[in-house]
Amino acid sequence: MPIANPAATAPYATRAEETRGRLFQEPESATRTAFQRDRDRIIHSGAFRRLKYKTQVFVYHEGDNYRTRLSHSLEVSQIARSVARVFGLDEDLSETLALAHDLGHTPFGHAGETALDSCMRDFGGFDHNAQTLRIVTKLEHRYARFDGLNLTWETLEGLVKHNGPVVTPGRSIADLPRAIAEYAETQDLELATYAGPEAQVAALADDIAYNNHDIDDGLRAGLFDIEDLMALPLVGDVFQRVMDRYPGLETTRVIHEAVRELIGTMIEDLLSETRSRLAEARPRSAADVRAMSRPLVGFTAEMTEHNAALKAFLFERMYRHYRVNRSMSKAQRIVRDLFSLLHGEPDQLAPEWQAGCDGPGGIKTARRVCDFIAGMTDKFAIEEHARLFDLHDPRA
């Protein structure tokens, strides 16, 4: 029988000892809960290790101090565990989902995803959440008896639904990314309901970490300065308070103090709003949380507006900055070049990636090439492009 997590004390917490199990049955551990085993499998996966060299905005060689997908995932997991602990949830499940949520991202961040989705337009498209599901259910080859990591139902559910129900009145299973729709035929993840509370915590921890650490990275890179932030609601107020509190403080310390305070403020808002929703809904189980008409975990309306203003600022001043655009344009060209060549000439793939292809230009070949490129790090994609296209590259 699965063992329990004694720290998950809330009646609405997901119970490790009551897990719906794994697709392939395995003996239970005598020392770890089901969700602790999921977390450990994620950490030991090849896809997780590669996050070290996958970036969100800046290509890997632009500086050692910018965040990678790996450092971001660790920051998300820290916030998620802290919030889950406050509410008596299963911290291990929240941590697992935080660590795994970016596994499906391409090299070069959203620019790489846009390029790969365009390449796959006639072959089912590309979606990073669906790719995460493919990785943990098919593409990791570490076990003798099954492909993937054989994670629990609760972890898979959280990975697919952390942003809310994916089947809605206006969206059927047929409209979903192919990987999710196909997996739904194998295992029912209850796609029309919300995810459990631990997944909801991980999703908002991602929002908190992403936005605030992009402020840090954008300021470090000189894409905007503190003065540009002063007109933003909440953000400008926090920076002003820090500068008033510590007159003459060096800029780097001002940034660290302000970002830390912003993260704390957003967490406090999340805690307050979620307590209010708990008092209203009074869920008695994780199933009650899934059946709610809105998320249990959330921000106040005011904080949601502040977040939207910050995202709009970052989109305009950071993600569309000409320096970022130049870098991302090059990155997209690399992805398109790699896909075009390898899809048309799959014999250029390593033998293990040729397996499952159906010839030049084939549908199965497209998905194999897509999986290959999506799993690349920024560094490997650049080097592979040079090997395939640069006649003077000694590695060709």
UniProtKB/Swiss-Prot annotation:
GO terms for molecular function: dGTPase activity. Disulfide bonds: none annotated. Residues 69-211 form the HD domain. CDD domains: HDc (cd00077). Keywords: Hydrolase. GO terms for biological process: dGTP catabolic process. The keyword Hydrolase applies. The keyword Hydrolase applies. Pfam families: HD, HD_assoc. PANTHER family: DEOXYGUANOSINETRIPHOSPHATE TRIPHOSPHOHYDROLASE-LIKE PROTEIN, DEOXYNUCLEOSIDE TRIPHOSPHATE TRIPHOSPHOHYDROLASE. Belongs to the dGTPase family. Type 2 subfamily. This is Deoxyguanosinetriphosphate triphosphohydrolase-like protein. It comes from Parvibaculum lavamentivorans (strain DS-1 / DSM 13023 / NCIMB 13966).
